[in-house]
């Protein structure tokens, strides 16, 4: 059996078990592919609709003005320690036993096989004058397979030895969420006789659309052969009576609400620029637990018989560990400081330092980031970008380009990130007017 197929099936099955939970530094998605193209190193240079989520002060700087992005989208996916590139090596062929053994050793050493998938969509991002408006939806799902579950996927219930063995699924996790944010940004120019300077503020209103947190237990017993699994899950659901049991009413997309404030500063003197921003200076977002349910789902399969249960219950019955996980899913403050130099009229280099003030909370980006980027505009209709950064426990590198056809821009970027969030591949595409 092909291991890459089994692993994919396992990830899909876990996703189906319940919506997931990961984490984000700012609730508005990055609408600009330029930001990813320079690896996020544009706090001092960002303009137009890209400034709304990065540094709102850029809206009052020269080069902003009108800009419009048409449904820009960013996707991300990753596996760790067995990576997407590891699986790609065996696309369409059987994975040798020795390779599966090595993979399982890596998973055992890491403690789990982690997977992540997500998408950020900006329904619109618009700037005019010193004002910016954006609405975006962020969806993220991650899971962790413990070594026992990974062994079952790679080798079946016989295990790696070929003889039936007890395999534990304890430690299986599936976390996911979706939220939508509307943001209003204002850039405020500051008077100066020697440079261009501005302050900026963004006010965000976030709605939690869906949430799911699940923790797995049980496993496979060898003698007698038996599959006994449990899944304690909290998820978006209003519990209703349904026949002899309970069920869920239609999903309420207003599963949590909150308001956040971001601040920014930017200065440009001759060829040198400075920028700083703090996202979530204040953020009141929290999930509405009245719109969550708990299920102690279980399934038992023995020779000739089976039994399962998955009826939802009131959230109040959830274990304390799941309630704590829900309470922790909030937005934490993040600071970004950047500098840039226009080496020439067509070439700009920039550097950034980012740090989130907490290890907890929603985190789609690394806690720490120190990097540099560059943009070259000397090819007329083609603008090129690249960047790299040292991040928490790893590195990130990226590249991108824009095809500039008068006011119309077609922009794309890609990045690879390794670190505390595993190995993640990111891609971004945007059709825009007036900015990139």
What are the residue ranges of the model-derived segments?
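Gram-negative bacterial Sec-dependent N-terminal signal peptides
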Residues: 2-24
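N-terminal, post-signal peptide beta-strand-biased segments of exported outer-membrane/organellar beta-barrel
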Residues: 20-145, 150
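Outer-membrane beta-barrel porins/channels
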Residues: 25-36, 129-436
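A broad, structure-centric signal for solvent-exposed, well-ordered loop/edge residues
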Residues: 8, 12, 45, 60-61, ...
């Amino acid at each position: 059996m092909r291991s890459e197929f089994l692993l994919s099936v396992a990830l899909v099955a876990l996703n189906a078990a319940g919506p997931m939970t990961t984490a984000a530094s700012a609730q508005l998605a990055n609408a600009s592919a330029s930001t990813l193209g320079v690896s996020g190193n544009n706090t001092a240079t960002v303009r137009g609709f890209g400034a709304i989520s990065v540094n709102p002060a850029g809206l009052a700087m020269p080069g902003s003005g009108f800009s419009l992005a048409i449904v820009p989208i960013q996707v991300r996916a990753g596996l760790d320690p067995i990576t997407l590139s590891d699986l790609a090596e065996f696309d369409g062929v059987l994975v040798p036993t020795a390779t599966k053994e090595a993979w399982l050793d890596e998973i055992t050493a890491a403690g789990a096989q982690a997977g992540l998938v997500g998408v950020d969509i900006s329904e619109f991002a618009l700037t005019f004058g010193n004002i910016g408006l954006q609405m975006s939806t962020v969806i993220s799902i991650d899971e962790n397979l413990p070594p026992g579950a990974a062994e079952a996927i790679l080798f079946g219930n016989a295990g790696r030895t070929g003889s039936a063995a007890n395999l534990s699924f304890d430690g299986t996790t599936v976390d996911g969420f979706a939220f939508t944010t509307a943001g209003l940004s204002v850039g405020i120019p500051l008077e100066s006789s020697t440079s261009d300077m501005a302050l900026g503020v963004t006010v965000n209103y976030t709605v939690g659309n869906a949430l799911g947190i699940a923790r797995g237990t049980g496993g496979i017993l060898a003698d007698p052969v038996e599959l006994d699994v449990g899944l304690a899950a909290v998820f978006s659901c209003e519990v209703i009576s349904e026949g002899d049991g309970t069920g869920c009413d239609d999903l309420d997309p207003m599963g949590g609400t909150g308001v956040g404030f971001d601040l920014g500063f930017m200065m440009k003197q001759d060829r040198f620029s400075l920028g700083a921003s703090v996202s979530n200076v204040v953020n009141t977002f929290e999930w509405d637990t009245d719109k969550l349910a708990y299920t102690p789902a279980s399934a038992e399969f023995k020779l000739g018989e089976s039994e399962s249960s998955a009826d939802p219950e009131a959230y109040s019955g959830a274990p304390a560990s799941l309630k704590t996980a829900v309470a922790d899913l909030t937005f934490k403050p993040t600071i970004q400081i950047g500098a840039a130099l226009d080496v020439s009229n067509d070439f700009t280099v920039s550097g950034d330092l980012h740090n989130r003030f907490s290890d907890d909370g929603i985190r789609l980006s690394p806690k720490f980031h120190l990097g540099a980027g560059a943009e070259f505009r000397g090819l007329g209709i083609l603008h090129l970008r690249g960047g790299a950064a040292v991040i928490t426990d790893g590195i990130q590198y990226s590249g991108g380009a824009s095809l500039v056809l008068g006011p119309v821009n077609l922009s794309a970027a890609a990045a690879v990130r390794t670190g505390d969030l595993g190995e993640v591949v990111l891609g971004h595409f945007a059709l825009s007017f007036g900015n990139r």
